[in-house]
Regions:
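C-terminal structural segment of proteins
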Residues: 1-324
Length: 324
């Protein structure tokens, strides 16, 4: 690990006023990257003591989650468990208990890909070293994305939490250097990797202060994760979904997927294919076909196309009670 300057922030302005600094909160991802010298910041700003640790109701019946709320505390919150069950399940499906105790809401959104080549400084990687190439294109790509990829990068986004938040229609609250706060829909927060080194709309000196969840929506919701082992493994495919059935027909649908996209993946066309339909495996299959219609798999991750179809169908079957 290379030498760096360390600053402990006492106010948000200590962060937004130092745009050249790297932010550290729980450090569960950043410290690994620093030890491997994938990231070599000259200056760290520790935000762990900022007043961003509250979960509070919003005026419209939603929830404001401070950026420093830990994954463990968020998963255990009674309102989250009752009204945003898919989010609680997604959080508990990620990492380990020890990591969830340290990992924060803002840090989870900003965690870096687990692409092997991003972590190997001897290999070309456009995320780590722009313009050097993407080793995963012709190399080991089993974990990689099949949607939202470019000829510059096929890395998948690793977060479980962000997939559930994408399905729930979350917004990210961001504070700039001038103290002005803006909110960005999570659906607009992440960027397709045309420039793989730029992953989000965050500008230098900006700080995530909270995530805003809308008022709870009607219907049943769940989070399903398919992975190599039962715990402490990233998703090959995951689905966060909410479905409402009224008078025998689907009237509301919200679906986001993980493990298959360069970002938490939500395709409105998949949801639209379900609205007005009677729940049935044939209907779910057509929606699943839409999900993977534009997939561009590589040799190592081609299995994700049928796996994504099956996972979505199984999730919708569970939520609607359709007989197998």
């Amino acid at each position: 690990m290379k030498q760096f300057d360390y600053i402990r922030a006492g106010a948000n302005s200590d962060v937004t006023g130092t745009p050249d600094a790297t932010i550290i909160a729980g450090g569960t991802n950043l410290l690994d990257l620093m030890k491997l010298e994938v990231m070599t910041p000259d200056r760290l700003v520790d935000i762990s003591r900022l007043d961003l640790k509250q979960i509070t109701p919003t005026r419209d019946g939603g929830l404001r989650i401070g950026a420093l709320v830990t994954n463990s505390d968020l998963a255990a919150d009674m309102t989250v468990r009752s009204d945003y069950a898919a989010l609680s399940s997604a959080l508990l499906a990620g990492a380990s208990g020890q990591l969830r105790n340290k990992a924060t809401t803002g840090g989870n959104l900003l965690q870096r890909t687990r692409c092997y080549y991003f972590y190997d400084t001897d290999q070309p990687c456009n995320k780590r070293d722009p313009g050097s190439g993407c080793s995963a294109m012709e190399g080991a790509n089993r974990l990689h994305a099949i949607l939202g990829v470019t000829d510059k990068c096929i890395a998948s986004h690793p977060s479980d939490m962000a997939v559930a938040m994408q399905m729930l229609g979350a917004e990210v609250e961001i504070e700039a250097a001038d103290g002005v706060t803006r909110t960005v829909p999570l659906s607009d927060f992440y960027l397709i990797p045309t420039d793989p080194a730029v992953e989000t709309v965050l500008q230098p000196g900006e700080l995530i202060t909270a995530v805003i969840l809308p008022a709870p929506a009607e219907g049943r919701q769940t989070y399903r994760k398919v992975r190599d082992r039962a715990s402490y493994a990233f998703a090959m495919v995951s689905v966060a979904a909410r479905i409402k059935v009224t008078d025998g027909k689907i009237t509301q649908a919200a679906i986001a997927c993980g493990g298959i996209g360069s970002m938490p993946w939500r395709d409105p066309a998949v949801e639209e294919a379900l609205i007005g339909q009677e729940p049935a495996r044939e209907v779910f299959g057509k929606a699943a076909d839409i999900l993977v219609a534009e997939a561009t798999p590589k040799e190592g991750n081609a299995f994700k196309v049928p796996l994504a179809r099956r996972t979505l169908i199984a999730t919708l079957t569970e939520l609607t009670g359709v007989q197998q």
